[in-house]
Each structure stands twice: as C-alpha cells, then as structure tokens.
Amino acid sequence: MSRVKGGTVTHARHKKVLKAAKGYYGRRKSSFKVATQAVDKANQYATRDRKARKRNFRALWIQRINAAVRSHDEALTYSRFINGLNLAGIEVDRKVLADLAVHEPEAFGAIVAQAQAALAA
C-alpha cells in the first residue's frame, strides 16, 4: 500500500486561513500559527456581535421613538405611548415606528394622536 501524504489538504487549509486573515497587521496575516489564532478570535467576536447588533438596534429604535414622542407631547413617555398603541390595537414594530419618526414625522404624529386617544378612553 502506498503512503498517503496530506500536503494538498494542509496547503488548502493554510491557504483558507491566510485568505481569511488578509488585511491583518504583522505576522497575523502571514504566519499560519498566528493567523489561525487571529481568525478564530475574529470569528468569536463576529458571533458575539451578531447577537449584540440586535440589542443595539432595538435600543436605538427605542431612543428615537422616545425622542419623537416627547417632541409631539412633553407629558407622554415611551412606555405610555407603547401602552397606548397596544390599547388602540396598532401593531407596528419599533423598527417601523423609528423609521416613521425620522422620515415621516406627520404620519408618526397621527399614530401618536391615536395612542393618546386610546389612553384617554
């Protein structure tokens, strides 16, 4: 039986890691051993930050909605506005509400008025 050497597989694996490390600084882009560690850590950060991005955007949307609600009525808070939306039966998510607040303030104002009416009733 002939001897099997893993040269092509090893070369392909090294090439894949070094390609992923392209743009890194110093030996992180050229040394396989250091590049492997750098790419592994980068993948850990990427996984963590995909989860964090969802939290960050939700927080941003809430801040934008709160600011827009308070610009329409100083006494109305974000939490009371969301309660008013639920009472009025308006099912618009925070992403769309934040987009309306920024790009179409008059439409957002109409939604605020409906929420206030539901709270008053």
From Swiss-Prot:
Entry GO CC: ribonucleoprotein complex; ribosome
Pfam family, one: Ribosomal_L20
Keywords, ordered alphabetically: Ribonucleoprotein, Ribosomal protein, RNA-binding, rRNA-binding
Disulphide bond pairs: none
Keyword Isomerase: no
Gene Ontology BP terms: ribosomal large subunit assembly; translation
Source species, domain of life: Bacteria
Protein purpose: Binds directly to 23S ribosomal RNA and is necessary for the in vitro assembly process of the 50S ribosomal subunit. It is not involved in the protein synthesizing functions of that subunit.
Recorded family membership: Belongs to the bacterial ribosomal protein bL20 family.
Name listed for the protein in its UniProt record: Large ribosomal subunit protein bL20
Gene field: rplT
